[in-house]
Amino acid sequence: ICYLTFDSDKIQYVKRSLNEGWIDIAKHKGINFMVLSLHEVLKEFFKQDDYRVDAGEDAVEDEFEMKEVYDSLGENLKNQEVLEEAILSKQEDVKKEKNGVLLITDIEAIHPFTRFGPIEQKIYGKVDVPIVVLYPGEMSGSALKFLGFYPEDGNYRSKHF
């Protein structure tokens, strides 16, 4: 796993550059990126979560209740290891590709539910393919600060660029 770190105010630039040529350049050099968007993973999970619909409709008028619903959704996401399972599942597709590399995008979508460090901790020993994570945040020595405002997290085991 390696992190390509960039300032969070560059999210749109990185996304546009990725779509406008970075993947094509990599393919030309023999690297086959397979993209996993964490935004898409979350969207699919929450779309299928009946609790989100029922509780969300009841809480829409009450800010405290809405925060409780939001916190519960985050707990469901973490307890079911939705993101971890999506990464490990996509890894199986990458294994079938010659020179396959898993490219994880849109990790800003996991805020405020979690950060990527705890996800890496859970999957680290199960990773069998190269993974590149587009990481909006800051490097601080050997630590990373997700989105530039979370506290430094020195628990990342991987390389940071």
Where are these regions (language model features)?
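Glycine-rich, aromatic-bearing surface loops/beta-hairpins
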Residues: 114-161
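A short, acidic, amphipathic alpha-helical segment used as a generic capping/interface helix at domain edges
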Residues: 79-95
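Conserved P-loop NTPase "ATPase switch" module shared by AAA+ and STAND
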Residues: 96-113
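A short acidic (Asp/Glu
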Residues: 12-18, 44-49, 112-118, 142-146
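Long, charge-dense
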Residues: 33-81
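Glycine-rich P-loop/Walker A and Walker A-like loops and their local beta1-loop-alpha1 context
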Residues: 1-26, 31
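Short acidic, S/G/P-rich loop/turn micro-motifs used as interaction or catalytic elements
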Residues: 9-13, 41-43, 74-80, 107-112, ...
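Structural alpha-beta junctions
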Residues: 20-35, 122-132
